[in-house]
Amino acid sequence: MGRKKAHTSFKGKQPGPSPQQRHLSAAKRNELNVLCEKLFHLSSNPAYVTQSWNNYLDISEVLLKVKRLEEMKTETSQRSQGIGQFVNWLTENGARVDGLSVVEFSGYDLGLRAETDFTENELIMEIPRGLIFSTYTAASELLVLQNDPLVQHMPQVALAIALLIEKYKENSKWKPYLDMLPSSYNTVLYMKTNDMIELKGSPTLEAALKQCRNIARQYSYFNKVFQNTNNPVSAILRDVFTYERYW
């Protein structure tokens, strides 16, 4: 995936589970693994491509069971509580945000508010390159997956795994930033079946079904990877990787 190779090698003790990790029982883990195998088959078999709607319904049924099993492992937090820590983190790491504040706008979400008048073409914000989250600036552990086909050829997948690594490893320097990220987005992955039905007859339906299928395949694939390999990434994500956290 084009990452620089000047990273420290990972020898010796691997990262242990973070305080945020909660283990599934062996029985529930086995049940989840079986569901993931079924999910991978449904989302990978080319025979289902010509039956995209029925395939979507089958995938949704399996995912509902998956999310019920993983529900106990999903936490929520109030993003606005981390604003002060986030702004301090920015300035301590060289960002310039004078005259701006992060606020919660009623009926919307978090955003930037000007606390002073700015002239036309005036620079209002300056963010160092080192504070731009990417697979080059974060999650050096990802190097162990550099030959994984999904990580290697799909930059958005590599970035998603990098975000999870930094979120769940101990003492991540990116924690103030990650705590500010939204917990949900307005995409087809958050739509219920009844919502998807409304897209029938629209040219966007096929793209939406394909997106849902792709994410289901990626999730089931990485679930198997993290459960069956021993490396720094699996040590961090094995017990915290869930469908909802991934998508």
Locations of the language-model features?
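SET-domain substrate-recognition elements in eukaryotic SAM-dependent protein methyltransferases
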Residues: P15-G82, N88, D98, F105-Y108, ...
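Short, Gly/Pro- and small/polar-rich lid/capping loops
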Residues: A95
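PEST-like, low-complexity acidic/proline-rich intrinsically disordered segments
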Residues: M1-K13
